[in-house]
């Protein structure tokens, strides 16, 4: 989140960022117009307070001298009412300014390509070769249902559409993948494992940038003012909220497992079948808190950490740099990792890794203390390491046999039966 002062001093930069992101830059005009009105009202309020103070002195002097001050007292009463009204106006304008500031997205990093949507994202690299099948590859949901390891019908009976029940080998594989991912990130990459709460307060969701923009995409418990998390990013960004971290403690690297809950309103097409787009799914999330000067190197290593899971599982994938029009609200730069899905005939997103720079740190009030004693905002990074259900779907499709079953990757097999 940016301050009013920052927008005033960097108006052209903010306008350019909004244009690149396909946002309406008139929001800046609206903000500056409200600010101009606020400043006029503040000046008027200051003048009223000056007159009130002067009149108070006159009343005090007349009372001390024993002279009649009734006329001044009546004027003072009216002035106090005017001041009260003016203070309310100023307060309402300040609240309006804050609401507008909350709607401003992060400014894209200079290395992010300008584009209007996903069609203008830039492929960075590929790993592995998609397998050539001697038969028509089946979609993972058919494989799962035929093997009786994914049950969509009973899940729908229990909860409605776009839920799944894992059973038997399916449940065992889902759990094994979670453990495999977490253990790899802890043992090989130096992350600290956290299992966070799955329900968060409004302030927590605001810190990541999910509120107010994405309110309608989250499940909400109004009696408790708690949201079911769409990703462990929410509780983990808030993990150090209100704290001042010592620079020497950075970077902090966390790997968090959680169930995730998303309304997915408006989702349609092939992705709504199977495990790709569920209302509830499991995900392993990577979070970093870094010094500003180190954050882009840390972003590259985070992407590499997420890639390593796919490499160990020998799943073909590609890395894509998102353009300005396709990035998330809080991101300054984002890489997507997309895994090859044979039945789709294309790559499908399985991880998104972003540097939010100081944007989330400011919203969540996470600060760092430099060696000279000054305070700064650290940079916060997040990424999937990986989406578990999508990883299982990719295994089922890429390792499928002609008889409708599938092999288990060697790395996972050794881990599974350890």
From Swiss-Prot:
**What Gene Ontology molecular-function terms does this entry list?**
ATP binding; serine-tRNA ligase activity
PROSITE patterns the record matches: AA_TRNA_LIGASE_II
The entry marks the following residues as binding ATP, namely 262-264, 349-352
Catalytic activity of the protein? tRNA(Ser) + L-serine + ATP = L-seryl-tRNA(Ser) + AMP + diphosphate + H(+); tRNA(Sec) + L-serine + ATP = L-seryl-tRNA(Sec) + AMP + diphosphate + H(+)
Record InterPro entries: aa-tRNA-synt_IIb (IPR002314), aa-tRNA-synth_II (IPR006195), aa-tRNA-synth_II/BPL/LPL (IPR045864), Ser-tRNA-ligase_type_1 (IPR002317), Ser-tRNA-synth_1_N (IPR015866), SerRS_1_N_sf (IPR042103), SerRS_core (IPR033729), tRNA-bd_arm (IPR010978)
Q: What pathway is this protein a component of?
A: Aminoacyl-tRNA biosynthesis; selenocysteinyl-tRNA(Sec) biosynthesis; L-seryl-tRNA(Sec) from L-serine and tRNA(Sec): step 1/1
Q: What class of enzyme is it?
A: ligase
Where is the protein found, in the record's own terms? Cytoplasm
Known EC number(s)? 6.1.1.11
Which UniProt key words apply to this protein?
A: Aminoacyl-tRNA synthetase, ATP-binding, Cytoplasm, Ligase, Nucleotide-binding, Protein biosynthesis
Enumerate the Gene Ontology biological process terms. selenocysteine biosynthetic process; seryl-tRNA aminoacylation
Binding-site residues for L-serine, renumbered to this chain: 231-233, 285, 384
Q: Does the keyword Cytoplasm apply?
A: yes
Q: What is its main location?
A: cytoplasm
**GO (cellular component) term, any one:** cytoplasm
How does this chain assemble? Homodimer. The tRNA molecule binds across the dimer.
Q: What does this protein do?
A: Catalyzes the attachment of serine to tRNA(Ser). Is also able to aminoacylate tRNA(Sec) with serine, to form the misacylated tRNA L-seryl-tRNA(Sec), which will be further converted into selenocysteinyl-tRNA(Sec).
Query: How are the domains described in the entry?
Result: Consists of two distinct domains, a catalytic core and a N-terminal extension that is involved in tRNA binding.
The entry assigns this protein to a family as follows: Belongs to the class-II aminoacyl-tRNA synthetase family. Type-1 seryl-tRNA synthetase subfamily.
Q: Spell out the protein name for this chain.
A: Serine--tRNA ligase
Task: Tell me the organism.
Answer: Coprothermobacter proteolyticus (strain ATCC 35245 / DSM 5265 / OCM 4 / BT)
Gene from which the chain derives: serS
């Amino acid at each position: 989140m940016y301050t009013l002062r920052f927008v005033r001093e960097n108006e052209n930069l903010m306008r350019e960022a909004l244009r690149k992101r396909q946002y309406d830059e008139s929001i800046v005009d609206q903000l500056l117009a409200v600010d101009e009105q606020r400043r006029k009202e503040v000046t008027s309020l200051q003048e009223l307070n000056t007159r009130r103070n002067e009149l108070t002195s006159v009343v005090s002097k007349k009372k001390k001298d024993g002279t009649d001050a009734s006329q001044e007292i009546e004027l003072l009463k009216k002035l106090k009412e005017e001041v009260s009204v003016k203070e309310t106006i100023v307060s309402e304008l300040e609240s309006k300014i804050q609401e507008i500031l909350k709607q401003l997205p992060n400014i894209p990093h200079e290395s992010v390509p300008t584009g209007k949507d996903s069609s203008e994202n830039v492929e960075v690299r590929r790993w592995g070769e998609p397998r050539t099948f001697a038969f028509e590859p089946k979609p993972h949901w058919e494989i799962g249902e035929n093997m009786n390891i994914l049950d969509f019908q009973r899940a729908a009976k229990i909860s409605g559409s776009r839920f799944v029940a894992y059973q038997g080998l399916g449940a065992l594989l889902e759990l094994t993948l979670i453990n495999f991912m977490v253990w790899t990130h802890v043992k090989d990459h130096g992350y600290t494992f956290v299992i966070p709460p799955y329900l968060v307060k409004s302030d927590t969701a605001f810190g990541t940038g999910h509120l107010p923009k994405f309110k309608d995409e989250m499940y909400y418990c109004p009696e408790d003012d708690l949201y079911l998390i769409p990703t462990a990013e929410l509780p983990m960004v808030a993990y150090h909220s209100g704290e001042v971290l010592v620079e020497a403690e950075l970077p902090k690297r966390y790997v968090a497992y959680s169930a995730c809950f998303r309304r997915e309103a408006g989702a349609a097409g092939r992705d709504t079948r199977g495990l790709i787009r569920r209302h509830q799914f499991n995900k392993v999330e990577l979070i970093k808190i870094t010094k500003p000067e180190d954050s882009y190197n840390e972003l590259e290593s985070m992407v590499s950490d997420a890639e390593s899971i796919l490499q160990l599982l020998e799943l073909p994938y590609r890395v894509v740099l998102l353009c300005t029009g396709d990035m998330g609200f809080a991101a300054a730069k984002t890489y997507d990792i997309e895994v090859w899905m044979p039945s789709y005939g294309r790559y499908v997103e399985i991880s998104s890794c972003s540097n939010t720079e100081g944007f989330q740190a400011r919203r969540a009030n996470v600060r760092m203390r430099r060696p000279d004693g000054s305070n700064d905002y650290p940079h916060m990074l997040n990424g999937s390491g990986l989406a578990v259900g999508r990883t299982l779907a990719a295994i089922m499709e890429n390792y499928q046999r002609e008889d409708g079953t599938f092999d288990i990757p060697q790395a996972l097999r050794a881990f599974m039966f350890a």
